[in-house]
Amino acid sequence: MNNSISISIIAPIYGVENYIEKFADSVLSQSYQNIEFIFVNDGTKDNSMSVLNGLIDSKFSHLKDKIKIINKQNGGLPAARRTGLDAATSDYVYHVDSDDWLAPDSIKKIVDEIERTSSDIVYFNLVK
């Protein structure tokens, strides 16, 4: 694996103040490097964005050039995903919910499968 495949991780943010720190830490700590991070603030009324921005400033400032934060009025999950998709510039996109978390090598495993199979779409089970 040579990090030649680019991935955009798209995460709508709405009402996840209690989950956003663990989620963002897991996403921004991926072992794979060629990632664009797109966080879509879907008009959340809680402190989700403050927590996210604080985490980026304190722990992930070295990734700021790879992070896009898009603010929009609340339109629901499909509209937020579409907004993120419109902003994505990578070869592949990965939609993830902001109350979930990723293992440190999740994206690497996805890219390994893309390279192994030359797939356009990769589908996999989630661990609960």
Q: Which positions does each model-derived feature cover?
A:
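Nucleotide-sugar donor-binding/catalytic module of glycosyltransferases
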Residues: 1-128
